[in-house]
Amino acid sequence: MHIQELKELAMSRIDDLIAEYCPDGVERKPLGAIAKLYRGNGLQKKDFTDKGIGCIHYGQIYTRYDTFTSQTISFVDKKLADKLLKVHPNDLIVTATSENLEDVCKAVAWLGGSDIVTGGHSIVVRHHQNAKYLSYYFQTLDFFQRKRAYVHGTKVMEIKKDDLAKIVVPVPPLPVQEEIVRILDSFSSLEAELEAELEAELEA
């Protein structure tokens, strides 16, 4: 099985797992009913420093981060950080713009121990759910089909904060979310192992 097929299988498992753990059905709510959403501003790559307050630039979410992270690869000085949107532990950072539909709403869950900051073209989702569960859900076909109704643009695709808040998401009980995350994490670990093996074979 190819790595991409494995990833798609893992994401498709969310619906199966919800059906398994919630046989009587699962409550679905607009994202805005379970979270507060905030639009970022400012922050350019030229603002990065070697140390300071951790930051995640929206462009890095496409290329440098996966489903979740507890460390940032970039920093800004405190003076600038004070002007930027704060990201609390357990928040999601979601891309608001991209050149293609697939990358709009790409999410990374912030699992670090302290606040960081983000900037323009990012939406912070503050909630009381399992952050990794929500971040995984943002990768599903179900979410993709729902977001299409709200993404607009041609050369540059964009979603507004208030429209992202309208997207309906499944909200199983927290213990179910945790079990789903445990299973999907195991898929991700297997995917990482396969990628490492493939790289080793190519270098051999």
Question: Language-model features: where?
Answer:
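A short glycine-rich beta-alpha junction/loop motif
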Residues: 115-121, 152-172
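Short, solvent-exposed loop/turn positions at domain surfaces
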Residues: 20, 42-43, 80-81, 111, ...
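Sequence-specific dsDNA recognition surfaces
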Residues: 33-45, 59-91
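Amphipathic alpha-helical segments
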Residues: 1-11, 25-27, 165-203
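A short beta-sheet element
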Residues: 57, 81-141
